[in-house]
Amino acid sequence: MAVVAAAAATGSTTRSGGGGGEGTRSGRKKPPPPPLQERVPLGRRAAWAWRLAGLAVLLLLLALLALRLLRHHGGAGGDAGVWRVALVCEAWFAALCALNVSAKWSPVRFVTRPENLVAEGRTPSTTAAEYGELPAVDMLVTTADPALEPPLVTVNTVLSLLALDYPRAGERLACYVSDDGCSPLTCHALREAAGFAAAWVPFCRRYGVAVRAPFRYFSSSSSPESGGPADRKFLDDWTFMKDEYDKLVRRIKNTDERSLLRHGGGEFFAEFLNVERRNHPTIVKTRVSAVMTNAPIMLNMDCDMFVNNPQAVLHAMCLLLGFDDEASSGFVQAPQRFYDALKDDPFGNQMECFFKRFISGVQGVQGAFYAGTGCFHRRKAVYGVPPNFNGAEREDTIGSSSYKELHTRFGNSEELNESARNIIWDLSSKPMVDISSRIEVAKAVSACNYDIGTCWGQEVGWVYGSLTEDILTGQRIHAMGWRSVLMVTEPPAFMGSAPIGGPACLTQFKRWATGQSEIIISRNNPILATMFKRLKFRQCLAYLIVLGWPLRAPFELCYGLLGPYCILTNQSFLPKASEDGFSVPLALFISYNTYNFMEYMACGLSARAWWNNHRMQRIISVSAWTLAFLTVLLKSLGLSETVFEVTGKDKSMSDDDDNTDGADPGRFTFDSLPVFIPVTALAMLNIVAVTVGACRVAFGTAEGVPCAPGIGEFMCCGWLVLCFFPFVRGIVWGKGSYGIPWSVKLKASLLVAMFVTFCKRN
């Protein structure tokens, strides 16, 4: 693990100890300071309208379950087993619906007031420029693979962070980059970027640049017009910065990794390649930053995100400092937003409705989930300290019990223990005059074996043992009694790149689902955190919804197979159109989709976006979630191990977008990954079932069969064919990357043949 620290501006990275008012110095009572944030619940009428709509869907699901229990089976000659399978699946869907109603019951949003972020002992007459002693912030950036995450992507992220607006930024902001791939190219690119930052940061602040990632700024603005002396000065500076950035890009792109290893630092990189790669990136950055700058606030960022709102830190401080009780804001999470996002979200991974509806509802309980990037953490919360902690002992002697506990939790580094002690007990840290004096200490605490025998990775730092450590870490913080806040700003605080194409999207969803499944079956299950810790019950239910995504796979897959099975075996699992009970599943189908559609409309999204997300939910469930479920099942049986899969980032940030050649980025692409086999097979199976059923109806062979499939079964198959239409097109018309490979078609055909054979025997 290569770790690089950079100052936010030229000069040293001297730290001040953090904020804290001195109180009223005179006997005269001061007026209360203006609020830094405002809690805005959803209007009562709107809130109850959404609640009743959700309850209506839930009641229809319960009515369908009652219908199943009362009828017991599909009628004379019907297969009771089919109805039992349907009953189990529908019971699962009803449970998920109840959890969703609970999570969205009390939606809340917070409005920040950075203009009120003024000096200690704030008064209404204090100007907004007098910020006082705001806490320092350590900004932690993670990258893993120089091929999938090009160095220029990381460079733009770092440059945008260094240019953030913050009082005395050179003293209070520090940026750390950890490269889990230990790439000499990434380290070289950051060294090159350091010189460019000396000119870029002042340029951004002088002219109030809104978007401070150079690749985005120069790609979205043409050469400005000059209309006077001031404009002429800006034009000259703009041209100079554009030329310097172009030179930086060329230097980074033209660098050869082998030449870096041969000249200037080869031994250094060889050492890290052999040793440090095994380290855990986020934990390492936490320890390294602790012994170097030890800011009480940490910002965690993925390498493919950049600052889109230069006042993002000030907005975060409004939420971290704006509550009477620190427990109200253990961390502040910014929703994920994407630049150059494809219109109408064709791959269902922009998650706008999830943040606007689901997470705003969770905010009314214990707060937003930690999403892994764009999050401001209290270092105290990351260290596993409960809110409002008051240490019983504050002895300064090394032999005290408090120091012994620190050694047990944080390891044997005296410097790290001292920094942890200052954070835990809100003590002032000594300003760092020269961070180079801590380089050797930083190397020691970043060693591979440092956390052995300590609490790192369990009770301290980011939690080990899951591919979705972000959710697990956030849950642990909530379980200690902390709350969290979703920070919604205009413009959005950070922007990132969303994967495009079938392979990248489904790989990402599979990785998430695998990690979520591992949490569900581990001792970190949220149910245990509610029983034995301080995780609130409704927050636990919200976690179960997200962690239970992959568990939906077997139920949705079984339910999706019921329609083809019943058509192929001349049975039914839904009431006939002529029966009284037919209105229940029909009303459920209409009401659920209408409710879901109205959620997207309320979020300002289009009908096409709703449909794209709906169909992707069906595709993801049958493909990525199914494979994730099987992966974790095999791991629990000791037959396999999970592997972290890096998702490729948008290389337009690195100016390597020359290979578009007219391609349609919103169209589904395929490769030979196993994740495509289940959906391809189910799409084929539904087409076969509809064809067989239509032939029976046309030739009258289904007449006289009391339990023959009805319109409900045909609607289910037809609906799935519509949802899987990208795969149908890939099977029939697709060519190149838009066509499903023959290897996938053959494997899917074999599965279909096996299922049809099974149906004939039944």
UniProtKB/Swiss-Prot annotation:
One of its GO terms (molecular function) is cellulose synthase (UDP-forming) activity. GO terms for biological process: cell wall organization; cellulose biosynthetic process; plant-type cell wall organization or biogenesis. The active site is at D180, D470. GO terms for cellular component: Golgi membrane. Its main location: Golgi. Its EC number is 2.4.1.-. Keywords: Cell wall biogenesis/degradation, Glycosyltransferase, Golgi apparatus, Membrane, Transferase, Transmembrane, Transmembrane helix. It is an enzyme of class 2 (transferase). Residues 1-15 have a biased composition (Low complexity). The chain crosses the membrane at residues 47-67, 81-101, 541-561, 582-602, 619-639, 673-693, 708-728, 739-759. Residues 1-39 are annotated as: Disordered. Pfam families: Cellulose_synt. Coiled coil: none annotated. It is found in: Golgi apparatus membrane. Belongs to the glycosyltransferase 2 family. Plant cellulose synthase-like H subfamily. Thought to be a Golgi-localized beta-glycan synthase that polymerize the backbones of noncellulosic polysaccharides (hemicelluloses) of plant cell wall. This is Cellulose synthase-like protein H2. It comes from Oryza sativa subsp. indica.
